[in-house]
Amino acid sequence: MPGLVPGIHVLLARQRERRGLPGQAHGRLAQSVLEEVHGIDSTRFQLVTNHLDSKRINTVQHQNIVFHSLLKQIPWTIFDRLVEQHDADWDDRVVKTKAHLIAMLYAQFGGARSLREIETSLKSHASKLYHLGGCTVSRSALSTANARRPAEVFAGLLSALMARLQAGYRRKIGDCVRLIDSTSVQLSGLSGHWATFSAGVCGAKAHIIYDPDADQPLYLMVTPSNVNDITAAKEMPIEAGATYVFDLGYYDYGWWASLDQAGCRIVTRLKVNTPFKVVEVRSVASGSSILSDRTGYLPKRLAASRKNPMSNLVREIRVVIETGKMLRIFTNDLTASAQEIADLYKRRWAIELFFRWVKQTLKIAHFLGTSENAVRIQITIALIAFLLLRLAHDATKIVTSPLAFARLIRTNLMHRRSITELLQPPPKPKPQQPMFKFEPHATRAVQRRRASRATCEVAA
């Protein structure tokens, strides 16, 4: 073969036998051997490879994305047990529960407002979803999963995360303060088959028990908006010995009596027209916001001559707030100071701030489904996202504001960065030695020497 040095024919024969090529492929094989032995490419430049670079091991460490750091906080063992318990992966045609959770959490952290936006965004990050344990999902599959998958799976995961956060705030039972309230969210008219509130208005309610010291919810119940607050409260678990603070939406003497029998301290409001039989008038400091401090009894009889179950000695404290309005604060605590009781009721605003933060930061204003199950899943996963942000924020403390931290997470969600370095500029890439360098076409004598060495190596 013209132009080939002695010894190349041996290589060609062995390569042809190894690859099983016919004889007419001899020309193409000769060109490939030239590239392998001589380093001559189609541009007729000599390709010289550094021996050390060819065997160099890539020591660059893999950097997970920010979303992965958030998902690490999830107790996946408990989650898998919940999936099996509720048979959540019963249908292979529906997206798996883990991929469903990851997609919905991406919508919460990333601010996606529709199923189509979730589908498109996940497709653009398909290569990164593998390390998360997720996958791309179509909007039809996600819609079906929201409508059919049991919401109890995600409710159980929410309870596990709540318990994990609560474990870091060990206190005496008497020091536990629990705030109870609800918030309403508006739904589209397509949810009218289960969430009709009035003519043309549909909505749902999220009933929450909130711990102001730990700054986290402890209990969640989602109902249609026409369900009364006290109806949901009667199904809430009661923690014996804790202090419960709530507003006039939970005005029920029977429920108050059940809290009193459990040893709980009650701090709430009395209606303006509620009679109060005074037994003792206590002194108050002049010039303070406390107008009066009295002990006595509630009415013995209710409507339709029903007996009042709240028959023990109780206390009424009249307070003037900043707006000049007078409040009648009710409590069954006869020993604490009037100012302490007033301050406890003032702490009720912490749950209102929590509702505002969740509505402004997470996605419960635009719902991805119209069924009751889909709404329950989205609200539950929104609170799961809140707890994951809390766990990550407590572990890093790169910023003091939870809102600023949530914005940083949203901006860098799919970036390969550490959560602790979100405020720092990304490091500059280190200059690397080129794997190849180009030299002019080597001389015929150099080719002959290299071919001879290659022939000896193959023969050996």
Where are the regions that the model predicts?
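A cross-taxon signal for low-complexity, glycine/charged-rich
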Residues: 7, 13, 23-37
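N-terminal basic, low-structured, amphipathic or hydrophobic segments
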Residues: 2, 18-22
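Single, function-defining residue in the core of a domain
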Residues: 40-117, 121, 146-149, 156-157, ...
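Extended, structured, electrostatic nucleic-acid-contact surfaces
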Residues: 125-132
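Major-groove recognition helix of helix-turn-helix-like DNA-binding domains
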Residues: 132-148
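Short Lys/Arg-enriched helix C-cap and helix-to-coil transition segments
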Residues: 152-164
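A short, well-structured juxtamembrane/interface segment
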Residues: 162-169, 229-230
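Cationic, low-complexity basic patches in intrinsically disordered or flexible, solvent-exposed regions
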Residues: 16, 32, 47
